[in-house]
Amino acid sequence: MLRSLPQLEELSIGFSIPLPRPSAERELLHELEAPVTLPVLKHLTFRGVGAYLDSFLAQIRAPLLEQLGITLFNQIAFELPHLSHFTNTTEGLRLPIAKITFERDAFSVVADGRAQQVGDGHPSFSLRVICKQFDWQIDCAAQICGALMAMLSGIEQLTLDLDGPGQSMSAEWQDDVVDGATWRELLGPFVGARELHICHALVWELSCALQSGDVGLDLGFLPSLEVLAPEFKDDHADNAFASFILTLVKLRVAQCGCRLHQ
């Protein structure tokens, strides 16, 4: 059907059922011989499960796409090779600024060329996953970021945020234990990030994750980082990342002359 709509500029696809019927999924995963090019498509939105999304993106090309908005239902594992290829080969989705926000019922990964669009408005790229538990959100976000590494490796400024009452960690979330390795897995794909901004509600979580184990000894972890900007509300918290910063300074200043500021 899409072949008959070469002038299509906006396309929205949505499913209300979280899980696909097995037979329907097999049919969707059967790719066309040649992808359909939608030469003037500028806005694409999708709501459903990852298998449907990935299958659909394998079958289209949208060289002039300006905005991609995705909402996925929660699932145990995210394997999105065609989404990764689609974002990496679409010129309008090569973006320098990203923000990962954790909310009460979902988390989102958004990216744009302007900071104000990432924080408010309509970003060029947004991917939202519906799930409630904080530890599950972090795990899913790590999987999503890993799947989108080709795209996220070009991000230069990254913000980690929490959207809630007073922007503070809820009581039920405080009981969720997130392994430090999972946080590092989430940050790992951002190899081009020069700035990392962290909201005050996540400072303790991130400081523990970045200072545990031998993460600071790995030059492949956040290799381009120059500015670490945690948001502090506690006067005694300004040394939360001191150990991590000191390790990076020792390893990197001597080798590449980069500067790192807190």
Please name every model-derived segment.
Residues M1-Q262:
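Leucine-rich repeat
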